Amino acid sequence: GGIIKKIEILLTAKSNRYLQKFNITWSQAQILKYLAMHAKATNTKIGEPTDVFQKDLEEFFGLSNPTVTGLLNRLEAKDLVKRDIFAQDRRWKRLILTQKGYEIQEKSFDGFVKMESELLETFSKDEREIFIKCLNSLYESLAKEKNFTF
């Protein structure tokens, strides 16, 4: 039992090793990817304030406030993300993906595409098709349950 968790742990470790050259972690990469996808979906220019707040990240990733605060603090210290005070409510800060953050997100994503291809080479063509079909079904089921897609 627990094979999915075991695979998750191994993939996270492999991802963190790969991301060392970008000086970010898997969790930080996920936040950068989320902000980049959100900017693209809303036609927000990189470096411009978005309508994404810390609370959105907490809900989307199922993380606690202190965890997301720590992730954002580290990303901000690396100049990958900025926080912008929201004019309508000064307690809220909008998140901004910096150009540097966007570039790291783009470069690191290319490596994940390659990593995925290498992992799938473990299987024959037929096994790959079945495996991807099963993963897509699982993803769709979980995404509906949580009401999001990534």
Describe the role of every protein-language-model region.
Residues 5-8, 33-40, 109, 136:
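Short, locally clustered residues in the helix-turn-helix/winged-helix DNA-binding domain
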Residues 13-67:
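N-terminal helix-turn-helix DNA-binding core of bacterial DNA-binding proteins
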Residues 1-22, 78-80:
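N-terminal leader segment of winged-helix/HTH proteins
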Residues 42, 48-49, 126-150:
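C-terminal regulatory/oligomerization modules of transcriptional regulators
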Residues 12, 43, 73-133:
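Charged, amphipathic alpha-helical coiled-coil/dimerization segments
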